[in-house]
Amino acid sequence: MLIYLTDYLSQYISGFSVFHYITMRTIMSVLTALLISFVIGPRVIRWLIRLKVGQSIRLDGPETHLIKTGTPTMGGVMILFSVSSAILLWGNLTNHYLLIATLTMLGFGVIGFVDDYKKVVYKDPNGMRSRTKFFWQSVVGLVAAFTLYSLAKVPAETQLLIPYMKDTFIYLGAWTVVLAYFVIVGTSNAVNLTDGLDGLAIMPTVMVAGALGVFAYMTGHLYFSDYLQIPYIPGVGELAIFCAALVGAGLGFLWFNAHPAQVFMGDVGSLAIGAALGVVAVAVRQELVLFIMGGIFVAETLSVILQVGSYKLRNGKRIFLMAPLHHHFEQKGWHESQVIVRFWIITILLVLIGLASLKIR
């Protein structure tokens, strides 16, 4: 929104022209989202406490988590508000990539909100029925995937790029919609599964979002995309502002979610930010790089799939002490803080490996 005001003011005061550049608006976006999170955080927490929106802890989970019963949940609303506010202020609202990413994030946020509401009001740790949740995730995911496909303007938007290999891609055509759907919905659920310890999901999300912001800027820049020999997609650079807002809001939320957490993001947060990562990765054609950088999310998801599969196919035998994976390490004796920080360290390494694909090819 402010881009229009600064464009007008730049006619009279040349200094305002700096806000036309994506780099400057990206910086302002991360700072704005961070500041808003700091300001509204304590108020949101007090509001959630007054509403008695406390977390219900699964009885089959680690016993050490029972102490967290009653901690305010649904704190993801502050993430969504901070991100949306920063985008409204610094984003180009005519850019369809930015609009699709924002609306997809909010759509999954609504699904998560309903899920959290059922958990809180009915004191049911399982919340919304799995089939119902998956149905609505599929609806929002397919709408986002099909919209991106229908608005594609360059061949790269219907290709699967192979990282670390020069000019190597797989033409997908209409199958792009299918891939996009699985990436968006899959990432949303993967982040949701990871959100089981204080700060465990939000910090990897911040790291991956920051890296995807770099990919978005480079892919949307004619000179840099040519220099790095990656596809040029006009307009997709605006997603750097979206990613920056997610980074700022995520760091602001971490301030209150760090161990011992004052608030949990709930499904309203985890489903939304996961979908946000997925839709950005699809838009900038870095689905495989997301798979690498989000390795923690992938490992958490696979641990659940393998655990359930093993239990059903091997007469109740389990692979892990408990799933998702972070609970397995807790059961092995790792302190919660050790699990969190070690998973962060792994994510840092994976993000650096992902970013290296910009030059290694």
From Swiss-Prot:
Q: Where are the transmembrane segments?
A: 21-41, 73-93, 94-114, 134-154, 168-188, 199-219, 236-256, 263-283, 288-308, 338-358
Pathway listed: Cell wall biogenesis; peptidoglycan biosynthesis
Query: A single GO molecular function, which one?
Result: phospho-N-acetylmuramoyl-pentapeptide-transferase activity
Task: Return the CDD domains for the record.
Answer: GT_MraY
Task: List the InterPro entries hit by this protein, alphabetically.
Answer: Glycosyl_transferase_4, PNAcMuramoyl-5peptid_Trfase, PNAcMuramoyl-5peptid_Trfase_CS
Record organism: Hydrogenovibrio crunogenus (strain DSM 25203 / XCL-2) (Thiomicrospira crunogena)
- Report the NCBIfam families cross-referenced here: mraY
Record-listed E.C. numbers: 2.7.8.13
Look at the named UniProt entry and state the broad enzyme category this protein falls under. Answer: transferase
Task: Please verify whether the record's keywords include Cell inner membrane.
Answer: yes
HAMAP family to which the protein is assigned, alphabetical: MraY
According to UniProt, the name of this protein is: Phospho-N-acetylmuramoyl-pentapeptide-transferase
Sequence similarity:
Belongs to the glycosyltransferase 4 family. MraY subfamily.
Identify the keywords attached in UniProt to this record, alphabetized.
Answer: Cell cycle, Cell division, Cell inner membrane, Cell membrane, Cell shape, Cell wall biogenesis/degradation, Magnesium, Membrane, Metal-binding, Peptidoglycan synthesis, Transferase, Transmembrane, Transmembrane helix
Q: Which cofactor does it need?
A: Mg(2+)
Q: Per the record's keyword annotation, is ATP-binding included, yes or no?
A: no
One of the GO BP terms on file: regulation of cell shape
Q: Provide the Gene Ontology terms for cellular component.
A: plasma membrane
The reactions it catalyses are: UDP-N-acetyl-alpha-D-muramoyl-L-alanyl-gamma-D-glutamyl-meso-2,6-diaminopimeloyl-D-alanyl-D-alanine + di-trans,octa-cis-undecaprenyl phosphate = di-trans,octa-cis-undecaprenyl diphospho-N-acetyl-alpha-D-muramoyl-L-alanyl-D-glutamyl-meso-2,6-diaminopimeloyl-D-alanyl-D-alanine + UMP
Pfam families in UniProt: Glycos_transf_4 (PF00953)
Localization of this protein = Cell inner membrane
